[in-house]
Amino acid sequence: MADEPLLSVERLSKRFPVAGRRGSFLHAVDDVSFTLAVGESLGLVGESGCGKSTLVRLLARLIDATEGRIVFEGVDLAEIPAKRFARTPQRGAIQMVFQDPTDSLNPRYTARDTIREPCLLLAGMDAKAADARVDEVAQQVGLPQALLSRFPHQLSGGQKARVGIARALAPRPKLLILDEPTAALDVSVQAVVLQLLDRLRRELGLATLFVSHDLNVVRLLTDRVAVMYLGKIVEMGPSSAVFADPAHPYTQALVSAIPGHGPRIRLDGEVQSPIDPPPLCHFRSRCPAVQGRCQREAPPVRGGGHQVACHFA
């Protein structure tokens, strides 16, 4: 059906066994659900350790899920073992732009080799078509032809970022996962790369999952935003609504750190352990509005377009 989402994540969880503690598990991603439409941009925010990176690895099929579904264009990718996913048609349809372009580029490959490889391996192009595609995406990302023969150590940070973006675009994906794509770049280059990514998303009709610590960037460049805390999505909705009127106490604290968003809310208390967490509110030890009910039961997810997991929001 035309109104079906491109991606539907349903009750996705990832638990890692804890060494030396038989029967104990670290709940990195805990019962996460969301959808992503064709051409839509979803931001993913939260403190370090909240589960963003694990969720990205699950969606990119780098690791297997413990439970749940990852339905992409009607196919449940969670049923395909991560080791086999690279040989499926969906591999080229889901691509990543990594946090550090230097670490993600093969030092023995020229820029042309790097962009050409997914054309051959993922898109099934012949050599002539692959070379033509390299030239096409190089032009799209603003990478001069003269730079295509250079190796990573001969490129600037911004140029390496463009190579990484071109590599991701080469097999004509439908979903781009942007994992802190400018975190390793100089501030002077970050804005240029972000503008490039936003323009390409709109021109090519790409769906994007944008992972970032920069809340201002997420607010400006995404249609919706999901806020994660200890493996769970605690709030999700239109970016404009979430940033203008955050409903969850954790989101309120995050947004208060943005200049011009009212007085800063500082969180006290200890972060709960993600190892074998009880079925209660994960935020209860730091929440300034905690009540007895929070200590007895997990909050349900409420709302339609703007969802929040809090008893009292």
Model-derived segments and spans:
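ABC transporter nucleotide-binding domains
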Residues: 1-244, 308, 313
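Short catalytic/signature loops enriched in Gly
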Residues: 3-5, 19, 25, 236-313
